[in-house]
Design a protein with these regions (language model features):
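Mature catalytic core of soluble alpha/beta enzymes
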Residues: 2-350
């Protein structure tokens, strides 16, 4: 009997230990991530200080949000809502989902705000250059001249009541590459908040949104990319919480021809890449859709006009890095910006 009692005790102990291990595994909080490739980029979403069971439920839904937006706003998918709008340019209005209507409406707002430096009707130009793809090339001057009249956000007609989009001219083509990721990041952040997630990192191909605190319960330290082509290290970092950080730089995608670099940020007014003294512009904002639209357009405005424009927009800050290694930051970042590379130096705005 004593022997049987010992065996029973050992079995009971093992059951309790197993239950404890399983319980710790199920209820222990940690960081769980998911990676995918949509919107022409690598996306990674990390949920912090969360139970695995909850992460397993939420991450597939996050993946679906990104996939749905990709299917609505992709230029490459013939059946996307964006492709349908473009195919019907000059023909008829197209009824669209709330998501793409809201993105286009916001795009037109930023086109007006920046006097056309940001223009989603830039599609004929981006298709001509195709920078970032295998068949990228430098178009002839006549080719650019022929498509420039089609690049005009003022020819986008929105009917809010009917939820329709109409492009007035045949050959017009919208390209949402400069704003779709920002919209997507905001939608993911909203979904996570509504489902009880307090801390997370959303990284959509460099469009970063940080929610709450990091795994040490502190503000996130987000690195600012060094624009130098031979560098993989950040040149600075900023400490932020519940913010979007979006950078547009000439180092991201470019075409090199006959020793000349042509970066991917095209001026909708000239048809050629923006030409100024900036290497990159980083926008820090509450909403990622704002940062996405502003990063390119503020770059296009150049240092002086861009800096003044940012100062006039409430709740938005920026980091400007010039080609001569000067760094300008707006007032809202002065207490949480750290320079890491002595090649660069902070300059005071006049």
């Amino acid at each position: 009997m004593k022997k049987n009692g010992k065996i029973l005790f050992l079995i009971t102990t093992l059951i309790l230990l197993t239950a404890l291990i399983v319980s710790n595994t199920v209820f222990k909080k940690g960081t769980y991530s998911q990676t995918n490739y949509y919107l022409d980029t690598v996306n990674e979403v990390s949920l912090i200080n969360i139970r695995k069971k909850q992460a397993d439920k939420l991450l597939p839904e996050v993946d679906k949000i990104i996939l749905d937006i990709n299917n609505e706003m992709s230029l490459q998918l013939p059946g996307s809502e964006l492709s349908k709008i473009n195919k019907n340019a000059g023909i008829k209005a197209v009824k669209v989902s709330d998501d793409i209507f809201n993105v286009i409406e916001k795009s037109v707002y930023y086109s007006k705000l920046t006097n056309g430096e940001f223009d989603i009707a830039v599609g004929p130009l981006t298709s001509l250059w195709n920078i970032g793809n295998k068949n990228a090339r430098v178009p002839s001057e006549s080719e650019i001249k022929n498509v420039l009249p089609l690049v005009n956000y003022k020819n986008i007609v929105l009917n809010k009541a009917e939820r329709t989009v109409y492009l007035k001219e045949k050959g017009m083509k919208l390209d949402l590459g400069g704003i779709a990721k920002g919209f997507c990041a905001d939608k993911i952040a909203s979904y996570l908040k509504n489902n009880g997630v307090k801390d997370a990192i959303i990284n959509l191909g460099g469009n970063i949104y940080v929610l709450g605190k990091n795994d040490r319960n502190k503000d996130f330290s987000v690195g600012i990319q060094d624009p130098a082509k031979d560098s993989s290290s950040p040149m600075a970092n900023i400490k932020v919480s519940n913010k979007s950080i979006v950078t547009s730089g000439i180092y991201e995608r470019y075409l090199e021809k006959d020793g000349k670099i042509y970066h991917h940020m095209l001026n909708p007014k000239t048809g050629y890449p923006f030409d100024n003294n900036l290497n990159s512009v980083t926008i820090v904002s509450d909403k990622s859709i704002d940062g996405d639209a502003l990063s390119t357009s503020i770059y296009g405005l150049g240092l002086k006009e861009g800096f003044e424009k940012i100062k006039s927009i409430k709740g938005v800050d920026a980091i400007f890095i010039t080609k001569d290694s000067k760094v300008y930051i707006t007032d809202g970042l002065k207490n949480n910006f750290e320079l890491l590379n002595n090649k660069y130096h902070l300059a005071n705005w006049p």
